[in-house]
A protein has these predicted regions:
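A domain-start/cap signature at the N-terminus of enzymes
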Residues: 21-63, 107, 136, 251-254, ...
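Gly/Ser-rich "nucleophile elbow"/oxyanion-hole loop immediately N-terminal to the catalytic nucleophile
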Residues: 55-62, 104-135, 149
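Short beta-strand element of the alpha/beta-hydrolase
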Residues: 61-71
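Primarily recognizes the serine-hydrolase "nucleophile elbow" in alpha/beta-hydrolase
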Residues: 78, 118-121, 127-173
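Short beta-strand/loop motif that positions the catalytic acidic residue
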Residues: 176-179
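C-terminal catalytic histidine-bearing segment of alpha/beta-hydrolase fold enzymes
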Residues: 190-193, 197-274, 285-302
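Residue-level recognition of tetratricopeptide repeat
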Residues: 256, 386-387, 421
Length: 475
């Protein structure tokens, strides 16, 4: 079965010792109020991060900090999403340019580098250190928080806990989860409600209109706003009654809007979160009554049944596609009486049907399921192909995975780039050039990734390769 999962390693995060008394150095040249794409670590120039310092940053007081982990080492992306909240609430935000899905030591090294460097450069509030991540980066953030005991809260986007780590009463951090309704990990984030509650972990899970991606700016801002609230509740931030009242009214309006739009499941979760989040900060009796009323309503029960049916159909389609892939790869056909197709014909038919459903202009059950299934299959194949290519140099198997990834989603240029790499490694110049051409035609624009890759050395003198590079230089 083809699955996408975070690498299961049980290494313990080893923190580099630090003290708030460390000298704050080399910050004068870093602009405030602007995203800086690359800050090299003072102790290791191979480690870098994207950074946002609030415009009013001063070393005269300590600041909350949010460390971000992207599955593809794109440090800029999370900083872009969280910089508005950073400016509004006075947080330092940084995203590693090194951390990525793969060997756990890569994540640990990036984490240690960021942790050490920020304490050397900036005035950090060690009581208010947070971590966020997307997909495999979300699992990395959770694992770090569970291991180091220094993280006050985690914002997990597009994924939850590592497969070998479950919510526990020993965990000290609060948890904010976010997932798009079209995310193939949507069910995973939603299913965390029960284990988080049983473990006594203060939490909120928010959904948004989107796929498997970092959350949009409003959701990222809501996550930081919620963390501010929890800091006040936990005594790590001075109580601000105006902030508490305004946040209460905002969340209450959002819940009522969802309920009025008959989005009962989302409304119920928000009401439930309101009661839990504000208990101890203000009277929540009215909302607790609302939670009980809505929890027993026919409307919510119907919404839950519909959501569960979506998840079941998603899982059934995922299983069916994986079976068809295995049958096609093995040269065998399955259930040939089904619609008169064997595996080789049935697989592209199902993929075509799902792509049509995924392109629908309006949200629907069919569109959500199609997008979840296609994106989940693509990511699984893509990550598998890259692992076989880079870590194992198993070019033939990598070609098989990446080629299928391009069939699942023919609009993603990155898959064609890595497929070209695999073909080049397998000494198939013709297909390597074809795939590289397709990658550029579909939007691949990073000429440096091609010129720096030794796998393409055998192609440099080919006229088609030179045409590709000339086209990139004109862009």
């Amino acid at each position: 079965m083809i699955i996408s999962s975070f690498v299961r390693l049980s290494l313990i995060v080893t923190l580099v010792a630090h003290s708030t008394a460390l000298a704050i150095t080399q910050t004068s040249s870093i602009p405030r109020g602007h995203l800086v794409e690359r800050v090299e670590a003072l102790n290791d120039s191979s480690q870098s991060y994207a950074l946002y310092l609030p415009s009013n940053y001063t070393p005269d007081r300590k600041w909350p900090v949010l460390y971000a982990f992207d599955p593809g080492a794109r440090g800029r992306v999370p900083v872009e999403r969280f910089k508005e909240a950073a400016e509004k609430y006075g947080w330092i935000v940084l995203g590693s340019n090194n951390s990525r899905n793969g060997p756990w030591n890569v994540v640990v090294n990036a984490w240690n580098a960021m942790l050490t460097d920020t304490h050397q450069r900036f005035a950090i509030d060690d009581e208010r250190t947070y971590a966020t991540g997307f997909s495999g980066g979300a699992r990395a953030a959770v694992r770090i928080a569970a291991a180091c005991k220094c993280i006050a809260g985690v914002v997990a986007n597009g994924a939850g806990f590592p497969v070998d780590l479950a919510p526990s009463s020993q965990m000290h951090f609060v948890f904010f989860g976010a997932a798009g309704v079209d995310d193939f990990n949507y069910a995973e984030l939603k299913s965390l409600e029960e284990p988080l509650t049983k473990a006594g972990i203060i939490h909120r899970v928010q959904t948004f209109a989107g796929r498997h991606e970092w959350p949009p700016v409003p959701v990222a801002t809501a996550a930081v706003q919620w963390m501010e609230l929890q800091a006040m509740k936990g005594g790590k931030q001075p109580r601000d009654d105006n902030f508490i009242s305004a946040t209460w009214q905002q969340f209450l309006r959002e819940a009522r809007t969802l309920e009025a739009a008959t989005r009962y499941s989302e409304a119920y979760q928000l009401y439930l979160g309101l009661a839990a989040s504000f208990k101890g900060l203000r009277d929540v009796a009215e909302i607790e009554t609302k939670v009980n009323q809505l929890g027993n309503s026919r409307e919510l029960k119907a919404a839950i049944r519909d959501e569960q049916a979506q998840i079941r159909k998603q899982r059934q389609l995922e299983s069916r596609l994986n079976t068809l892939i295995a049958a096609r790869d093995g040269g065998a056909s399955i259930n040939q009486t089904e619609e008169g197709f064997d595996a080789g014909n049935l697989l592209p038919k199902i993929l075509n049907d799902l792509r049509k459903q995924s392109r629908a202009s309006e949200d629907s059950t069919d569109r959500r399921i199609a997008r979840r299934v296609l994106d989940g299959l693509f990511v699984g194949l893509f990550e598998q192909g890259i692992g076989l290519l880079q870590a194992e140099k198993n070019y033939a198997s990598s070609i098989k995975s990446l080629k299928l990834a391009t069939e699942v989603n023919p609009d993603r240029p990155g898959a064609f780039f890595y497929l070209a790499w695999a073909y080049a490694g397998n000494r198939d110049k013709k297909k390597a050039l074809q795939s590289l051409t397709t990658a550029v035609e579909k939007g691949f624009s990073d000429a440096a990734m091609i010129t720096a890759n030794n796998a393409f050395d055998s192609l440099r003198n080919e006229p088609q390769y030179q045409q590709i590079m000339a086209r990139l230089q004109k862009q």
